[in-house]
Amino acid sequence: MIAKYIRVASDLHLEQYYGADIDKIVEACLAPDDRDSASILVLAGDISSTPDQLVSFISKVEPRFRHVVYVPGNHEYYRHDITTWVSETRALFEAHTDRTSYALGDEVLCHNIDNVRFIFTTMWTAGGEDLAEMGAVGAALNDFRIIALNGERFTVPKMSYMHKKMKATVDTFLKSNPDAVNVVVTHHMPSYRLCHPRFGNTINGGFAFNGDAI
């Protein structure tokens, strides 16, 4: 059986409602649909920067769907160390979810779900196409002020290094079975063409990357 439907949600930023009734949050964000039981739910990042709320939300919606696929966005890591967040959140997922696939930190995973290959990752961006753009992104985005990695400040060069590894892994997965039905899930936009002209500027490299050739 091939998955009939994919339902997508992202950028819910539930931390703004921390402490609110989780059932009401679920109802507000994902009103029931008659097709849910035959659907794969894709949660493409920026769901909540609070691990317990994040996993509580997913554990509540999980029973309605055939499967859930989740990747963090950049905001999940706000006011956290990425390495610590990954460890704590993985433990919560293992304890409280049954049919959720998740790629945390710099992971890129490929899971076959109902004869569809889901390749999923946050896919951090390269930070821009040149040093000037990378400098502008570093100065403008809060990511590089309130996220840490291994006890040190997260930086654009560190993000760019992660991006190169993640992008290469996605490419390898796609080439390994080009005839498969592939769905690639990322938080950051996989093409600069997806940036609205209204927002076209030198910091687009903090939100999108050049994945047109993949």
Q: Where do the PLM segments sit?
A:
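Active-site-proximal loop/helix segment associated with metal-binding centers of metalloenzymes
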Residues: 119-184, 188-209
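Short, Asp-centered acidic motifs that coordinate Mg2+ and/or phosphate
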Residues: 6, 40, 100-101, 116, ...
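Glycine-rich phosphate-binding loop signature in dinucleotide/nucleotide-binding domains
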Residues: 33-37, 113, 173-180
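Short acidic low-complexity segments
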Residues: 34-36, 101-112
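Glycine/small-residue-rich loop that forms an oxyanion/phosphate-binding "nest" at active or ligand-binding sites
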Residues: 82-104
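Beta-strand-turn-beta hairpins that frame and shape the catalytic cleft
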Residues: 1-7, 109-120
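Short, solvent-exposed loop/turn segments at secondary-structure junctions
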Residues: 13-14, 48, 75-77, 110, ...
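N-terminal active-site segment of His-dependent metallophosphoesterases
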Residues: 1-71, 76-84, 146-153
